[in-house]
Amino acid sequence: MKQPVFTGAAVAIITPMHADGTVNFEELGRIIDDQIAHGTDAIVICGTTGESAALSHEEHVECIRFAVKHTAKRVPVIAGTGSNDTAFAIEISKEAEEAGADALLLVTPYYNKTSQAGLIAHYTAIASAVTLPCIIYNVPSRTGVNLQPATLAELAKLPNVNAVKEASGNISQVADVAALCGEELNIYSGNDDQIVPILSLGGKGVISVLSNVAPQQAHDICAAWFSGDTAKSLELQLKALPLCHALFADVNPIPVKWAMNRLGWNAGPLRLPLVEPSAAVQQSLENEMKAYGVLK
């Protein structure tokens, strides 16, 4: 049995920016503190929601180092270090390990894609270069490649391939992963609207966008489930659905960064090519945050 890196809700945290587009580390620290104070079970730094694709190598490593130092072991810090360049993924994964990260989040190679055999070779090379637990991230809507359950079962044989963040949206596929991998691979939901379905298949929690704006609520969905109150967990999941949908009414992290600014955080601008959400998306976010109770 592989011990999970965390159990519950981990925030896929935004990267706040100054008006000039540089990283706002002071605000990042404030957000981390607030997340931990409101029940977040782990911090995921430099993931999709953190605009990792628009960060320079130096910024990427600096964000990881800052998150590790500022979090100070209060909760695990998971560093997004995936790349479609295996050599670069190894390099930045080693840097994350040296910085003191607790685990790595490794998205499947995108654009150049690859075969299932290539995915096995890619992840084997990274896992062999570090000692940290590796969380594989399957998000075919972004990468253009779907990591098959049988491929995950093969990768789960590697001692430090610890988990998968499953964001395919395909619950049947997640069930197949659970059946094939058993206790050799932990499963996290990569979609806030599928937390309870994945928990019901033995999942250990969620890597969450919702947690940015509602950390306590995302934590509570998972906590209720693990306390045995599955009816309460389902109730909380269903209550969150309209806001979850609003947060994905445009490409992530466009809506959530706007929402964080609206809630009073100095989240700052997006980096191009991402731009502000439409007026319709903004109004939807406004309405759903008020209905959910996170915006007065």
List where the protein language model places each region:
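Catalytic alpha/beta core domains of metabolic enzymes, predominantly
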Residues: 128-129, 140-248
